[in-house]
Design a protein with these regions (language model features):
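A conserved short coil-to-beta-strand element within the FAD-binding core of flavoproteins
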Residues: 1-7
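Acidic surface patches and DE-rich sequence motifs
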Residues: 4, 12, 84
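N-terminal small/polar loop signature for handling phosphorylated ligands or for N-terminal nucleophile
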Residues: 8-11, 15, 65, 70
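Short hydrophobic core segments
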Residues: 10, 16-33, 44-45, 96-101
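Surface loops and adjacent helix of pleckstrin homology
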Residues: 13, 22, 56, 112
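Glycine-rich beta-alpha-beta "Rossmann" dinucleotide-binding loop(s) and their flanking helix/strand
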Residues: 32-52
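An anion/pyrophosphate-binding glycine-rich loop and adjacent beta-alpha core
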Residues: 50-53, 59-152
Length: 152
């Protein structure tokens, strides 16, 4: 592969192709355990491109395993906030899957970039009752307590 004055030339074992534009689809380094490599980045660099710093995105969030392990396998619709010093860095709402190592699911994937680039001191807050105000949650808990006590 070579950059020319009017585009690019790509040589294979049997042919040579010329084009004004070139699409480089080489994957990335994610999933190195299943074959992800840096070759595409090197090819782009050889053509004069540069890249920004690499960081994980669209990934699960690892947490202290004490908490999610008990909920492993459970899915819940939640409001999710990534916070630092009680200030929101990023928010989302959607399905959260509890795993042995933390939390996953589409809503978590959407927020993972904010965590990857956010630096130190971040924490995740899950709201299991995103449509309820505090009074409604307390009322529901009170009713559940009465129901559970009646079954003892």
């Amino acid at each position: 592969m070579k950059k020319t004055s009017d585009g690019f030339t790509v040589r294979t074992e049997t042919d040579t192709f010329s084009a004004k534009k070139l699409i480089l689809a080489a994957g990335g380094c994610a999933g190195s355990k299943v074959g992800g490599v840096m070759d595409g980045y090197q090819l782009a660099k050889n053509l004069g491109h540069h890249r920004t710093q690499l960081y994980p995105s669209l990934v699960q969030l690892k947490t202290d395993p004490t908490y999610p392990r008990a909920l492993k396998g459970i899915k819940a619709e939640c409001g999710i906030a990534i916070r630092r010093d009680n200030a929101s860095v990023a928010e989302n709402r959607g399905e959260v899957l509890f795993t042995e190592y933390g939390v996953s699911g589409p809503a978590i994937f959407d927020l993972s970039r904010a965590v990857s680039t956010g630096g130190e001191g971040l924490y995740c807050v899950l709201n299991f009752f995103p449509d309820w105000d505090l009074e409604e949650v307390l009322h529901w808990l009170h009713l559940r307590r009465q129901t559970m006590a009646a079954h003892e």
